[in-house]
Amino acid sequence: MAKKKRNPSAEEAGDGEQTAAELGDFETTLGDVETIVRKLESGALTLDDSLKQYEVAVAKMRQCYQLLDVAERKISVLAGVDAEGRPVTEPLENMSGGESLVQKQASRGKRRGAVAPDHSASDTTGVDSADLDSAEDDE
């Protein structure tokens, strides 16, 4: 009896998660996508071949995104040091805390002793008040 060929697009359509080893190497997969893009941009392929290559590239991009998801889940961020001097880590997703980038910048600045920039809506003209004072003195 003949062996069935593997159909990667059918496997990806399933709900089961794949490990990084099953997905392959990110750099190699991304390199494959870049090679396909160069072929498509060259214009040397027929329409049918171009569509087939496009489908392969889309499947490989999905594979790249899955590899990035696996890598992101593995990343942990240093949260501090315990009483015995050992590093304490937290998963990456726990570190965001729902803060905006401006809030994170302000809290980081406070820890470093810097003054956070004023992003208030009161000065929306873009004109510095010192410039206005000097303009009045000129009159």
From Swiss-Prot:
Compositional bias per record (Acidic residues), positions renumbered to this chain: 130-139
A GO biological process held by the record: DNA catabolic process
EC number: 3.1.11.6
Any one GO CC term of the record: exodeoxyribonuclease VII complex
EC main group: hydrolase
Keywords linked to the UniProt accession: Cytoplasm, Exonuclease, Hydrolase, Nuclease
InterPro entries found in the cross-reference section: Exonuc_VII_S (IPR003761), Exonuc_VII_ssu_sf (IPR037004)
Region described as Disordered: spans on this chain: 1-26, 82-139
GO terms assigned for molecular function: exodeoxyribonuclease VII activity
Catalyzed reactions: Exonucleolytic cleavage in either 5'- to 3'- or 3'- to 5'-direction to yield nucleoside 5'-phosphates
Localization terms from the record: Cytoplasm
Self-association and partners: Heterooligomer composed of large and small subunits.
Cited function: Bidirectionally degrades single-stranded DNA into large acid-insoluble oligonucleotides, which are then degraded further into small acid-soluble oligonucleotides.
Family: Belongs to the XseB family.
Name this protein carries in UniProt: Exodeoxyribonuclease 7 small subunit
Species in which this protein is naturally found: Rhodopirellula baltica (strain DSM 10527 / NCIMB 13988 / SH1)
